[in-house]
Design a protein with these regions (language model features):
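Positively charged, low-complexity intrinsically disordered leader regions
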Residues: 1-59, 63, 131
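Glycine-rich phosphate/diphosphate-binding loop of Rossmann-like nucleotide-binding domains
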Residues: 51-63, 145-226
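Anion-binding alpha/beta catalytic cores of soluble intermediary-metabolism enzymes, centered on
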Residues: 93, 100-171, 266
């Protein structure tokens, strides 16, 4: 694996496939035995440097470390006040002397890059404004479990072309998934990320489609994915965003354009009645809690692989 995991584009196809394979094996062992036979992370610590609050990311990382014999040390914004009380390079240099791996959930991608630049231990992007690459790994594992294979699968994303959308584009393209994105004109994914995904897709024979039409995006999809319309830090834009995104709600009418057995996916937290109807997210096609569960296992596989274990 690369030294750090900062972007979903950091992995080659064989690396991404091996990670998913390993995550699936860890999941099977954990579900079958309720424990792992080997504890390769004994005596090892993961530092969780979080500027943003978290449920899934924090618990999945901490539980994953514990299940493999290690432990997690959680540092909230108020604990270190990174960039104000202490510079980002100094935080990285200090933590490198104590811990074996670092996961950062921050506001700006540049912060993750700076941590990686000055860290002597692997750094994992646990979410930033640009990407959510651990989530994308969990999503691909979920899709693979349900569909049997990823190559040629059709994944539709509708709503805000945000960090989650970016990582899905990049990792989907890497793994041969055809990704179609339906977003309002002013909320489309970053053109640089789209161009990068298109280059990757050229090698994997996947297709990338960007449209303003939610119906066109979900046409024939194996899975339909959405996220909140206003992410953390965008709450002040809520009032202006709601009417723009209303036509992009994932509800039974929109799902009818997808395949009959299409999955519904969401990274959570969700706002029922906004980006998705309660009927869909709480219905039989929803795999949102499988995605959440899979965060645990892909992150375990990622930590082990980054540490060469």
């Amino acid at each position: 694996l690369p030294r750090h995991y900062l972007s979903a584009a950091d992995l080659t196809r064989p690396q991404a496939e091996a990670l998913l394979e390993r995550a699936a094996a860890l999941k099977a062992e954990w579900r079958g035995q309720g424990r792992h036979a080997d504890l390769p992370l004994q005596g090892k610590t993961l530092a969780l440097v979080f500027e943003k609050p978290s449920l899934r990311t924090r618990v999945a990382f901490e539980a994953g470390m514990t299940q493999l014999g290690g432990n997690g040390s959680y540092l909230a914004a108020r604990d270190i006040d990174m960039g104000t009380r202490e510079s980002v390079p100094d935080v990285a240099r200090n933590l490198s002397r104590w811990v074996q791996v670092l996961a950062a959930r921050v506001f700006r991608h540049s912060t993750v890059e700076e941590l990686a630049k000055y860290s002597d231990v692997p750094v994992i992007n646990a979410l930033c404004d640009r990407e959510h690459p651990c989530q994308a790994l969990a999503d691909m594992l979920t899709l693979r479990e349900r569909r049997g294979r990823l190559d040629g699968a059709r994944l539709a994303y509708v709503g805000d072309g945000n960090n989650v959308c970016h990582s899905l584009l990049l990792l989907g393209a890497t793994l041969g998934v055809n990704v179609s994105v339906g977003c309002p004109l002013d909320y489309q994914p970053d053109p640089e990320i789209v161009a990068q995904a298109e280059r990757i897709a050229g090698d994997s024979d996947a297709t990338i489609t960007i449209t303003q039409s939610p119906q066109e995006a979900v046409d024939g999809a194996d899975a339909v994915y959405t996220d909140v319309w206003a992410s953390m830090g965008q709450e002040h834009e809520r009032a202006q965003r709601m009417p723009v995104f209303a036509p992009y709600q994932v509800n039974p009418a929109l799902l009818r354009h997808a395949r009959e057995e299409a999955l519904f996916m969401h990274c959570l937290p969700a706002h029922r009645g906004e980006e998705v109807s309660a009927e869909v997210i709480d219905g039989p096609q929803s795999v949102v809690f499988d995605q959440a569960e899979n965060r645990l296992h892909v992150q375990k596989a990622l930590i082990l692989s980054l540490l060469g274990l």
